[in-house]
Amino acid sequence: MVFMNWKTGVLIAIGLLIGGLLIGWQLSPRIDEVQPLEGGIQGRQPISIYFNRAMDPKSIEEHLELTPPYDVEISWDPEYKLMTFTPVNIWPSGETVIISLSRGVRSKLRIPFWQEFTFSWPVNPTSLVYLWPADGKSNLYKVNPDSGESQQLTNHPGGVLDYSITHDNDQIYYSIAEGSGTSKIMSIDLQSLEKSLIIDCSETLCALPQLSADGERLAYEAITREPGALPGIRIFNLRDQSELDLGVPDEYLENPLWSPAGWLAFYNQTTKGYQFWNPVNDTTRFLPNETGGYGSWSADGRYFLTSEILFVGDTLAPRHLQLYDLVEETTQDLSVGNFLEDLNPSFSTSGLAFAFSRKSLSPQDWTPGRQLWVMDLETGESTSLTDEVDYQHTSFAWHPDGEQMAYVRYNQAMLSEAPEIWLVNTTSGEALRLIINGFAPGWIP
């Protein structure tokens, strides 16, 4: 009887142990799913981990390792079952992001993980986006510079007029041509490639859409069909769908461009100068400028760089680089010498280096084309990256790594020749032709 009681006790103990283990296994935290499930990540694409139990965020952070180390924002759903990683900047192209959770991670019930978890995602290479063909109805394409693999992003019969890439590299805003001189402003999500109608410009020609850095306001150029109407700049509020018309009816406004710091720059053909507007506090500035055209913002939003014509004689009027400091409200001529003409400035995606096109106006050094130069604003040093006298170099687009740059070149000695998009390493000067008959290059993750 004693033997039977002892045997029964052992069986009961084993049963209790098994039951406890089963209960513990059922209550223990596990990872049910990760997103994305497969393939690479790009841009600021979030990574999500779904748990079966409510988790302790502090415990997660103590046992979490991200390789390579990278600044991310970690957010949780209200139930603490969904953890999302969003990079502060775009994921590093060409790297593999690895997220590891070691043993010891606990749930809200203080029950720990029983095993380690490691997940990895390759980061897709940065792609070049461009318009093609230059001699027809152009649409948006992208190409992998390493493999040469290309993909068509849009297929609008009327063609894409122009486009811009958002500051967070998540979307492209672009305008398409419709019948009777009208257009539409569209957007494309660079992760899903889903397209959305933003503004149906049924009575106007809308062009040059530019989204503010905070993603709240879309600036664009609008030309109404009314006789005698001048182009203007409109601001479309994406939150409340309201619209603001900048300027007055008798002013000719063009070329809107948002800074990373939230200022909008645009050119006023009527008053001959650049206007700057901060929508947060309604602050305005004005920079007199006879030349106009496109400018470029520095990565920190402090400097605006453009070109200005200088009258230095009866027959000599070169255009020089004009740097405007929004903090000090000062201007500086960056072009040295009266016989140099500098145009088309484009700041790097980081730091204070910028690209521009230069040609000499002196009779002995004059050439049909303009060459690509790079200048560092901090050191004042400048370097020529091309030396092809017949070619015009323009449309400079810096790679996010700050080392490579795409540009368009035109043969000024043979205007029937198609434009080409080239890629150059700004350190070595090594250049590679990527696209024939394409234009307007830009970079997307």
Task: List the predicted regions and their residue ranges.
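Acidic, low-complexity Ser/Thr/Gly/Pro-rich repeat segments typical of extracellular/periplasmic
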Residues: 2-126, 146-164, 170, 177, ...
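Beta-propeller folds
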Residues: 126-138, 161, 181-183, 201, ...
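Structural motif
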Residues: 136-142, 180-186, 227-234, 271-277, ...
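Flexible, glycine-rich surface segments
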Residues: 317-319, 329, 333, 337-345, ...
